[in-house]
Curated annotation (Swiss-Prot):
Family membership noted in the UniProt record: Belongs to the universal ribosomal protein uS13 family.
Subunit structure: Part of the 30S ribosomal subunit. Forms a loose heterodimer with protein S19. Forms two bridges to the 50S subunit in the 70S ribosome.
UniProt entry keywords in alphabetical sequence: Ribonucleoprotein, Ribosomal protein, RNA-binding, rRNA-binding, tRNA-binding
Any one GO MF annotation of this record: rRNA binding
InterPro entries with a match to the protein in the record: Rbsml_uS13_C, Ribosomal_uS13, Ribosomal_uS13-like_H2TH, Ribosomal_uS13_CS
HAMAP family noted in UniProt: Ribosomal_uS13
GO BP of this protein: translation
Entry protein name: Small ribosomal subunit protein uS13
Cysteine pairs bridged by disulfides in the record: none
Organism: Carsonella ruddii (strain PV)
Domain of life of the organism encoding this protein: Bacteria
A single GO cellular-component term on record: cytosol
Amino acid sequence: MNINICGVLISKKKNIVFGLTKIYGIGYSMSLKICSKIENFKNKKFKDLTNEEKAKIENFINKINVENNLKTIIKENFKKKLNLNSYKSLRHKKKLPCRGQRTKTNAKTRKKMNHEII
């Protein structure tokens, strides 16, 4: 009893607003915008939708960067920041905290973790 939207399985019993939040890159406010722009789906569930309404939702979501597209964009942006050789990128490369935390007594977890630089 699942529906496939953009490669994500969502239960048909779920409310549309909350079901769309299962998709990476769509939060509660974005799902409200999607529901209000297409039609007023706020109180509907996925099992009540027709095929045309499902297609409208999918077409609207395909215009937004979600799932794998969004993940690749985030990775590319992180790689660009690493190449800038700023203070923050140097701290990332050395596997140290980069937001001003002290490292004399703390940051043991950050130092010993096996981090992959993307």
